[in-house]
C-alpha cells in the first residue's frame, strides 16, 4: 500500500507541476481535452455530478512518458460545460510498476447497493469505479469507491470481483437496468471475440447471463464494449438499444475503429436486429468510444466521447509535452428514416457535437446563393486566427448538368496556413463519386511526410438530405481545432474525425473555395468563424 500511495502522489504531483507548462505549446487544441503532459488513450468512467453540476472524465494515462507504458493510471478531468476541461490529479493508481489500471466505467450507487457509503455521502455522488487490473499474469475486474465525489478512491478489499483466468478479459462498462433492478456489465473477452453480459445486485458478485459473439468486423480483438438505450430522432420517447464494440487492429481503413449494432435488450440478452455492423465514425482518429453513466437531461440521455487517435501511429504524432486528445462530446440519437440509398431506409446512429463557446468571432458569410464556376473562386482571410475554426456549408449539385466521368468534378475548400500557405488542408465533394474527401498530407511536418500509416487522403460517401428543382442538397459542419478536424454530414448522419499536423505556429486561417467544373455546384450557404 505504501508503494501504491507513493506512485499515486508522484503522478498527482507531476500533473500539478505540468499545469504550468500548458501554454508552452502553441498548437494545443482549444476545445478538445488534452492532458497537461504525458500519454493519454481510452476515456473511462464518464459521469455527471448532479449535486455540483460538474462532468467527470477519466482516462488511460501515463504521466511518465508521451507513449503508452506501465504503470498505467486513471487520469482525471472535470468540466462545467463539456467543452472546457480542468486537469485533476490522478484518480486511480495500479499496485505495481509492471501493472495497469486499465479501462473501465463509473456508476452512481444511489441506493447504496454496494454498502460502501453512509448518509454523509450525497446519493448523487456515490461513485463506484469498475475497472480492469492488468498484470503480466491476468486481467481481472476490480472496483473502487469514492467518498469525496470522484477525486480519490478506495480499493475494495476483496477484489477482484470478477476473474476469468485470462490475460484478455477487460474494459467493463456498467449501467443500472431499472426493470430488473440490477447492475448490468458488458466486458470483452477480447481475443475470443465475445462481449459477455453479467448481472449483479451489489457490484461485488456477478453472474454471467449471455454473450454477444463473433459479430461484425472481428479484426484482431474486441475492446471497450458498451450497451446503452438511445432515443430515436423522430420520437425521443421511443428508443432502441445500441451495442458499441471497438476493434484494434483490423479496421477497414487501418488500425482502430468503432462499430455498433442496433437491437433489443431484455435484461440478460442483447439481440441485434440484423447483425449488420455499422460504423460509428468514418475517420481515422476515433476510438474507444464510451458513453456517460448519467447526464444532465438538458443535454439528452445518450452522450459519449472517444479517443481522437489511431493505434497505428499514435505513439509518433508530433505533440509535446502531451500526446493525444479526446473528441468532442457527442449527443447520440437514432435516425429511423436514414436513407442509405434511394431504395433502403435503415436505423442509423446520429451524432451532434456538444460545443459551448462564448468567445467566438462573427460568422463570415461568403459565396452564399451563388453558382460556382472555374473562374469565380471565393476566399476569406481570418488574419488573427489562432487555428481553431468552425464552418457550415450547404451546397447542391445540379442533376441536369452533364459532366464527363473523366473530369474530376469537385467543390474544394482549402484551409491554408497564415504563416506558410504551402501547408494546408483540402477537403470537398466530388460529384461523380458522391463522396466528401479530405487531404491532410500537405504539411512540412516530418511525421506527416514520412509515417506510412498516417493516411493522407480519405473519403466518406454522402447522400443528399433533400432533392428539389433538379438540385440535390448536402450539408456539412466542420470544426478545425489546431490539429484535429471533426466533420458532421447532414446534421450528423455521418461523421468523420481526423487529426492533422502543421508546422507549429502556422495557424490555419485563409479559406478558399474552388471548383474544377462550371455551373455544377450551387452554394446555398457558406460561413466560417474563429473560435477563441
Swiss-Prot record:
Protein name listed in UniProt: Invertase 4
GO cellular component: extracellular region; fungal-type vacuole
Active-site residues, as the UniProt record annotates them: 42
Hydrolase in keyword set: yes
Record-listed E.C. numbers: 3.2.1.26
Catalytic activity: Hydrolysis of terminal non-reducing beta-D-fructofuranoside residues in beta-D-fructofuranosides
Residues the record marks as carrying a glycan: 23, 64, 97, 111-112, 118, 165, 266, 275, 356, 369, 384, 398, 512
Signal peptide: 1-19
PROSITE patterns noted in UniProt: GLYCOSYL_HYDROL_F32
Pfam family, one: Glyco_hydro_32C
Source species, domain of life: Eukaryota
SMART domains, alphabetized: Glyco_32 (SM00640)
Binding site for substrate: 39-42, 60, 102-103, 170-171, 223, 311
GO biological process entries: sucrose catabolic process to fructose-6-phosphate and glucose-6-phosphate
Upper lineage: Eukaryota, Fungi, Dikarya, Ascomycota, Saccharomycotina
Top class in the EC scheme: hydrolase
Alphabetically ordered keywords of this record: Glycoprotein, Glycosidase, Hydrolase, Signal
Family of the protein in this entry: Belongs to the glycosyl hydrolase 32 family.
GO molecular function, one term: sucrose alpha-glucosidase activity
Presence of keyword Hydrolase: yes
Amino acid at each position: 500500500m505504501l508503494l501504491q500511495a507513493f506512485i499515486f502522489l508522484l503522478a498527482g504531483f507531476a500533473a500539478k507541476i505540468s499545469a504550468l507548462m500548458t501554454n508552452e505549446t502553441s498548437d494545443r487544441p482549444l476545445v478538445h481535452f488534452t492532458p497537461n503532459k504525458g500519454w493519454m488513450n481510452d476515456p473511462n468512467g464518464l459521469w455527471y455530478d448532479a449535486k455540483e453540476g460538474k462532468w467527470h472524465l477519466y482516462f488511460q494515462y501515463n504521466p511518465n512518458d508521451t507513449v503508452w507504458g506501465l504503470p498505467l493510471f486513471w487520469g482525471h478531468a472535470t468540466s462545467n460545460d463539456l467543452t472546457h476541461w480542468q486537469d485533476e490529479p490522478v484518480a486511480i493508481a495500479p499496485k505495481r510498476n509492471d501493472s495497469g489500471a486499465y479501462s473501465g466505467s463509473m456508476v452512481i450507487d444511489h441506493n447504496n447497493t454496494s454498502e460502501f457509503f453512509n448518509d454523509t455521502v450525497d446519493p448523487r455522488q456515490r461513485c463506484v469505479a469498475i475497472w480492469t487490473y492488468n498484470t503480466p499474469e491476468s486481467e481481472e475486474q476490480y472496483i473502487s469507491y469514492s467518498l469525496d465525489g470522484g477525486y480519490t478512491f478506495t480499493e475494495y478489499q476483496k477484489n477482484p470481483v470478477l476473474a476469468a483466468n485470462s490475460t484478455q478479459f477487460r474494459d467493463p462498462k456498467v449501467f443500472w437496468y431499472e426493470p430488473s433492478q440490477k447492475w448490468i456489465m458488458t466486458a470483452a473477452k477480447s481475443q475470443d471475440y465475445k462481449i459477455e453480459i453479467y448481472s449483479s445486485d451489489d457490484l461485488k458478485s456477478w453472474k454471467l447471463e449471455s454473450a454477444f459473439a463473433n459479430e461484425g468486423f472481428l479484426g484482431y480483438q474486441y475492446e471497450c464494449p458498451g450497451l446503452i438505450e438511445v432515443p430515436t430522432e423522430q420520437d425521443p420517447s421511443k428508443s432502441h438499444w445500441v451495442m458499441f464494440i471497438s476493434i484494434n487492429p483490423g479496421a477497414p481503413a487501418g488500425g482502430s475503429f468503432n462499430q455498433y449494432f442496433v437491437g433489443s435488450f431484455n435484461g440478460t440478452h442483447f439481440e441485434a436486429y440484423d447483425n449488420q455492423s455499422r460504423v460509428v465514425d468514418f475517420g481515422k482518429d476515433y476510438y474507444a468510444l464510451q458513453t456517460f453513466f448519467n447526464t444532465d437531461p438538458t443535454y439528452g440521455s445518450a452522450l459519449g466521447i472517444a479517443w481522437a487517435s489511431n493505434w497505428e501511429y499514435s505513439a509518433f504524432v508530433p505533440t509535446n509535452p502531451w500526446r493525444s486528445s479526446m473528441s468532442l462530446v457527442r449527443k447520440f440519437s437514432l435516425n429511423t428514416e436514414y436513407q442509405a440509398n434511394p431504395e433502403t431506409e435503415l436505423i442509423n446512429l446520429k451524432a451532434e457535437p456538444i460545443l459551448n463557446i462564448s468567445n467566438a468571432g462573427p460568422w463570415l458569410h461568403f459565396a452564399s446563393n451563388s453558382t460556382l464556376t472555374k473562374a469565380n473562386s471565393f476566399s476569406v482571410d481570418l488574419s488573427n486566427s489562432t487555428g481553431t475554426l468552425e464552418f457550415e456549408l450547404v451546397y447542391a449539385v445540379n442533376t441536369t448538368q452533364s459532366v464527363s466521368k473523366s473530369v474530376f468534378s469537385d467543390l474544394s475548400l482549402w484551409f491554408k496556413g497564415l504563416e506558410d500557405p504551402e501547408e494546408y488542408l483540402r477537403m470537398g465533394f466530388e460529384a461523380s463519386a458522391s463522396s466528401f474527401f479530405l487531404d491532410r498530407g500537405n504539411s512540412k511536418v516530418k511525421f506527416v511526410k514520412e509515417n506510412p500509416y498516417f493516411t493522407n487522403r480519405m473519403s466518406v460517401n454522402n447522400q443528399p438530405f433533400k432533392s428539389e428543382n433538379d438540385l440535390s442538397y448536402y450539408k456539412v459542419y466542420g470544426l478545425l481545432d489546431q490539429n484535429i478536424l471533426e466533420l458532421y454530414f447532414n446534421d450528423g448522419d455521418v461523421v468523420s474525425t481526423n487529426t492533422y499536423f502543421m508546422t507549429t505556429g502556422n495557424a490555419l486561417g485563409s479559406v478558399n473555395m474552388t471548383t474544377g467544373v462550371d455551373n455544377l455546384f450551387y452554394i446555398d450557404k457558406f460561413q466560417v468563424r474563429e473560435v477563441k
